[in-house]
Amino acid sequence: MTEYNWNERHIITFPEEILALSTKDLHVYYGEKEAIKGIDMQFKKKKITALIGPSGCGKSTFLRSLNRMNDTIDIAKVTGQILFEGIDVNAANINVYEMRKHIGMVFQRPNPFAKSIYKNITFAYERAGVKDKQFLDDIVETSLKQAALWEQVKDDLHKSAFTLSGGQQQRLCIARAIAVKPDILLMDEPASALDPIATMQLEETMSELKENYTIIIVTHNMQQAARASDYTAFFYLGDLIEYDKTNNIFQNAKLQSTSDYVSGHFG
């Protein structure tokens, strides 16, 4: 078994003006257990960043902290800063509902609402009291087009979202997330429940979406990280170990642990 120097780090940084989001000394605790250990990390605007690492390394916990999803866990405590447009979204006075309009989330398994395709997209607007039908129609069409789903469902908008295939449901969830025009889209293993064809379609959708959005994705699929992302971060036991351009991580990693992990020789 290879012995690694876990004190080694290689983490790139970016100029402030091209940052979409950053964390400073971010810790996450579940009770007494420290799941994330003081991570400083920056995300570049309109790029796809993949978070990789063994099961239990903290990558999903880290992702969920970026828009306060860990708030729903009673024993979770998050300290440090999460900076979006100069504002610490981890501060106690932040309106979490409003913040999540800027930092959206797509979950591991498709979770459409028990409503029509149309009402899945308009849900947030109708909840806010918006009744302008033309406005809502335009939002539905634009969002579904951006999620590469419009052509498949444009004649069935008032059918139940549950009539869609798994891949279509996941793209509907993406459309629902981008309908409120977020700046950042968080994706927690969005292809894990999809077949290979639906996965490829999802990756193509992500590539188109990065023209308008910053995407941060957790994946266990090394091929997906290599294909779909611009930057990749390797996590291990709650620490950020290496963070660089995806080509560098997969072809010329600075650290042996990273190189072994992405090539399947880790351990």
Curated annotation (Swiss-Prot):
The UniProt record lists the keyword Transmembrane: no
Catalytic activity, as annotated: phosphate(out) + ATP + H2O = ADP + 2 phosphate(in) + H(+)
CDD domains: ABC_PstB_phosphate_transporter
Cellular compartment(s): Cell membrane
InterPro entries attached to this UniProt entry: AAA+_ATPase, ABC_transporter-like_ATP-bd, ABC_transporter-like_CS, P-loop_NTPase, PstB-like
One Pfam family it belongs to: ABC_tran
UniProt KW keywords: ATP-binding, Cell membrane, Membrane, Nucleotide-binding, Phosphate transport, Translocase, Transport
Enzyme class: translocase
Membrane topology: Peripheral membrane protein
Chain sites annotated for binding ATP: G53, P54, S55, G56, C57, G58, K59, S60
Primary location class: membrane
The keyword tRNA processing is annotated on this UniProt entry: no
Domain spans labelled ABC transporter: 21-262
EC nos: 7.3.2.1
GO cellular component, one term: plasma membrane
Matches recorded under Gene3D superfamilies: P-loop containing nucleotide triphosphate hydrolases (3.40.50.300)
Swiss-Prot/TrEMBL GO biological process terms: phosphate ion transmembrane transport
GO MF entry, a single one: ATP binding
Function: Part of the ABC transporter complex PstSACB involved in phosphate import. Responsible for energy coupling to the transport system.
The protein's assembly and partners: The complex is composed of two ATP-binding proteins (PstB), two transmembrane proteins (PstC and PstA) and a solute-binding protein (PstS).
Family: Belongs to the ABC transporter superfamily. Phosphate importer (TC 3.A.1.7) family.
Identification of the protein by name: Phosphate import ATP-binding protein PstB 2
Native source organism of the sequence: Streptococcus mutans serotype c (strain ATCC 700610 / UA159)
